[in-house]
Amino acid sequence: TTTELDIDRGWSPVPMAAFGPHVLTIGSMSKIAWGGMRLGWIRAEPGIIARLLAVRPSFELGTALLEQCIAIELLDDMPALLGHVRERLHAGREAVAAGVARMDGLAMPTTPGGLSTWLDLGAPISTRLARSAREQGLILPPGPRFALGGVLERRLRIPITLTPERTAVAMDRLAAAWTAVRDRTVDDALPLQPTAVI
């Protein structure tokens, strides 16, 4: 979940598991600390946790001890870790907003937290813009990669997790891609190859 990744609302929601004995919520260190840290947790009532623990050995090989030790250290000082993460996300969000402000026709919604923002392109051109961005050396998946039936063709997902310096470079490339799309100089015949999602 990204519940812990609030940037500036200043409140901590009650975990969904608090609203009923049959609700499970899942958290992850990969969202809070580092994407390569594949550790998480489940919040649920003790009986459900006991049943999950009973079947766990049948489908899991275990988690690396080093990562578990690192997670324990990080969890011991979660407020400081989350403070650092909020500062980083705030800086990344501001860098994206500064880049978007230079591109006529793009809109960035209020983004109070999370790892990314979804730009409103104003038209169903996300795939064309992703193709144009690739020509500028910027790999971004088009909106429909995240939904069925072309639903997000008017949106483009932009991460707010990078440093302001790296984000500024990415936004410069996106601006060049945006200009090419608006000037209709993008080769629509060029196939958009599968890419890793960033």
Predicted regions and their residues:
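Conserved glycine-rich beta-strand-loop-beta hairpin in the small C-terminal domain of fold type I
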Residues: 72, 89-97, 107-120
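PLP-dependent enzyme catalytic core of the Aspartate aminotransferase-like
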Residues: 135-136, 150-198
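Conserved core segment of the aminotransferase class I/II
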Residues: 24-87
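Short hydrophobic/aromatic beta-strand micro-patches
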Residues: 43, 118-122, 159-161
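Short, conserved active-site loop motifs that form the nucleotide-linked donor/cofactor pocket
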Residues: 23, 106, 138
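Active-site pre-lysine segment of PLP-dependent enzymes
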Residues: 2-32
